[in-house]
């Protein structure tokens, strides 16, 4: 597959725009185009933009369709992608070149087109916007600004190629592309109501009146000044000079990023030493401002360029990449503050560097505009994020630029150091991709449900809860989840981590809504709960913890006879007996147990069960061993207290605890967090410290539990391993992190140094294991580590939950119970529920909305199980198209528009890369042969050259040899997008 893009000819581009708008009301995938209805305008370079923002020079301003899509979203200031003397195939760009999962990184730079192609693209976009702005009622024909960008040295900028580019954008009227666009427009006046040939002739060919200068790292200040002076005096262009965050100095940048959690972002001081220095910059900018004023022009700064960092983990190809997005915001906003203070607020700034929905209006209110964006548009929603921003900006008071409000700017700069949006989480994000290949057809997937071990129908119950139908919501939950009250309280909710909303604002309150439904819908649901039949199975369940309770629920609901043997006096296992009350109330456990009683489950309490063989001999048809992980982990340090034993005592007999003032917990899982928080609540305790041989980022504890412990005052000592405990002192060895182990975490290595901590009680929270002796007594086959070899031990004996996995989560125990129940019964115990309403689902994609009341949170759910389209939205070039087939969105990749940036691969929930793995349309046979993608190209005889599963053949689009869904998608693509065959 080639990474060379094929610009769309103007007639085909306009055909797509007009057809899509008439059919769907959308423009190049922007589903609800922004209409500037207020009529308000700003003044910039003698032009009158309707809004003060738009896409930055980069992936969203390279092709005509990118600029048009941005305009449709409400952008009215377009910073065109930089051109330089190296272009086209002479400019190699490593691929993939973009990684925007959290903060952004890239290894691209100037346009990948040739300079003449770039000129054509910008002229096409300018002309197209002149046509559609008024025709579609989006705004005034002169309501937008194009700002060209050039680099990187004066000699290159003075070459004939770049000079022709600059002059062509200053006056495009004599360019072949302008003339071709004008001819097309005059031949299609009927497509634009009221448009006349005279009006077309009156379109201003002055595409750009301003320019942004980009220079390479290490460019001497004298060269920067020479280029800027040339652009001002010789080219008579309003000029912005792009500055680097390195102006802040290495120490400030390093300390700031460290304080915000980016200590592992690697860079040294060489760029800081070689780049423009602040002491040289300010006098230069004073001189250039004076020169601009003498020419009747504006001089300002573009803040800022991306930030160069080292590639250390193979994130992208090469040795150095450029950081953007939320991590760049604190640096760039402080650079803006520093420079504006030096100029007493009089310096004009074009801002980029982490701008997004959350800070855009504050920048504008401070007098910092125009503002350009990149990283936020690379995330789900893409260009559809723009209308919300445009509306917010248009609601502000428009005033002429008279200077920057330094107090507002300083407040923004200070806020950037404390706002959690710009801080990296304590722990790395969980993987958001599954381990499956994306299918060619029907790939929409809800990552929340996919990440859930029991695949809860989350959007369905969220919708029902939002409608106040809590009993129905609980019914949907209980079809797959036997413990709604327990999981609604303490589930580790991987669904929340997987929620696509994480890429917008805040994840949905999935667990909270589950608990809400379990509490408000419980009594009516319980009243109606009954076995669905009468089955012959008699199942003995050994252990009444979460696994045993869940298995009993699924079996009894289906009509099986179930008996639970529980050693203690109540069901719940570790959840009831160990997990502190401040995490889950006992009445939540009681409600889940009450459902078992309603289903007729027999519960034998305070009883140790017979062996599996004996139970089978006594008439049970099946035995399930749900006896937990009873073998407690040890540090093997004399005087240690086991965390489980401590938590049991703290929960059942808190008055008997005498643990002293200084408590140390060794370990870093959720049990360690529970033990530390419980110890803090014991009278007489002065402080609690967790020691861990790695760092917080490697801790196995959920980040939520870690943050709760920190908030309550638990101290953390990283890189310490306990070695001895005596005389109220704990001696620990200092550790350092080495290479990653098989789990991906960096292995701790000894340093030979020790440290001593005050310690009255040492609590060991170092994991539990299944009880190998008990399991062996029940005939369970064990591996070399003493763990069961399989969940299904025989046709009649099963092991599940912690007894199978070791310490695991409640929802994993439920997943084991589901699978076991279905094997015992020979039927599925689950139903599939899909949210019935798709109203506004598409409109929500792009809208940022912070979490509110949990029961109203469905308004933020995007229904990813029905409509995903992440790959469509995040592609700057519109290379992934949504084709609706039988009421479902399918995705077709358009080869000629793709430059293999890799952004769609980042946000696809599958392990795949849509630009490589989805069904692909090729413009001709040469492009088809240059790729291994599944897909097709149309031949002049009306047949298609097809590739599927590695096989190539000629076929009619209705060829029965084609899979029916693929054939239908190919036909529908050509019907909905006939311009593809013409381009």
Task: Label each residue range with its predicted role.
Residues 1-234:
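N-terminal capping/small domains of soluble enzymes
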Residues 39-47, 436, 521-539, 645-660, ...:
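A short, basic/flexible loop-to-alpha-helix module at the beginning of a structural domain
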